[in-house]
Regions:
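C-terminal active-site "lid" helix and adjoining low-complexity regulatory extension at the edge
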Residues: 195, 213-253
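Short, flexible loop/turn elements at secondary-structure junctions
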Residues: 46, 67, 118-120, 135-137, ...
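A short glycine-rich, hydrophobically flanked beta-strand micro-motif that places a catalytic Asp/Glu
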Residues: 130, 205-217
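Short catalytic/ligand-binding loop motif for oxyanion handling, primarily in non-cytosolic enzymes
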Residues: 27, 50-53, 69-74, 82-83, ...
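A conserved helix-loop-beta module that forms one wall/lid of the active-site cleft
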Residues: 1-80, 91-103, 113
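Active-site rim elements
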Residues: 12-18, 181-186, 198
Length: 253
């Protein structure tokens, strides 16, 4: 699996991948390709932290950069936001070249900006679970449900993996993510998420399409083209070979 991801970085280059990796451009693509109703509300796009007028923002929101991974800042109460710490994190992220770090081709040339979005909450007022649909050759195969992704309250970040019939699988896409010891109820909007994932992954050897489900409404999260940058520690080990065989590269070789 990892070797195939590395191969994709070096050989599978289509212009639309730049759009998918750009958190601003992909929203425009989704709006035209699918349905703007599945997009998380955007409050603003900024060239720098100093450009943000926090008086115009709601009490809660999410800040992140448009060109990278891992720069997310969750603000639940802007009166409590540590501006010094947040500015330092985002300024560091704005200078980061995601392409040079891991040679993930899709990130090459994306202009870095800061995007501010609505903070989604589930019916219990908590951050919603992530539904990550892993697609192979344009077909959804597995759905990983992420819990406690941001380790709130020190909780462990765990993952539950299911097939498209919602049968629980006993593996994880990365050893850094614990395997959930419980079974998640089949989401009512599963077929809708799979439909969107099938449409967005068409023509790609492997991709991951992320969604949130809030108040029984599907929201698009992001498209990931290189799972864990091609350095995932799949558990158990034999799943790495099985997943790798699911990626067909013959068309390009």
């Amino acid at each position: 699996f990892n070797e195939k991801i590395q191969w994709m970085k070096l050989n599978d280059h289509e212009f639309k991948y730049h759009i998918f990796a750009d958190k601003i451009a992909v929203k425009k693509y989704i709006s035209k390709k699918l349905n703007s109703n599945i997009l998380i509300r955007t409050y603003g796009v900024y060239n720098s932290y100093d450009d943000i007028n926090f008086d115009e923002l709601p009490d809660s929101f999410v800040l992140k950069c448009s060109h990278d991974s891992g720069s997310v800042v969750i603000c639940e109460d802007k009166r409590q936001l540590n501006h010094e710490k947040t500015k330092k994190k985002l300024n560091r992220a704005l200078k980061r070249n995601q392409y040079l770090q891991g040679r993930e081709w899709a990130y090459k040339g994306i202009r870095p900006k800061i995007i501010c979005e609505e903070l989604l909450r589930d019916e219990d007022g908590e951050l919603p679970k992530d539904y990550k649909v892993y697609c192979f050759n344009g077909n959804p195969k597995y759905i990983a449900v992420f819990y406690n992704r941001f380790h709130r309250g020190g909780a462990e970040h765990v993952e539950g993996v299911y097939d498209t019939e919602w049968t629980k699988q006993e593996f994880s896409f990365d050893w850094n993510w614990g395997i959930a010891d419980f079974t998640e109820n089949r989401p009512e909007k599963l077929e809708e998420m799979l439909k969107y994932a099938r449409c967005l992954s068409r023509g790609m050897m492997q991709s991951r399409i992320d969604f949130y489900l809030v108040n029984n409404r599907v929201y698009f999260g992001e498209i990931t083209l290189y799972t864990v940058g091609g350095f995932s520690g799949t558990v158990p080990d034999d799943m790495d070979e099985k997943l790798g065989k699911m990626i067909r590269t013959q068309t390009y070789e």
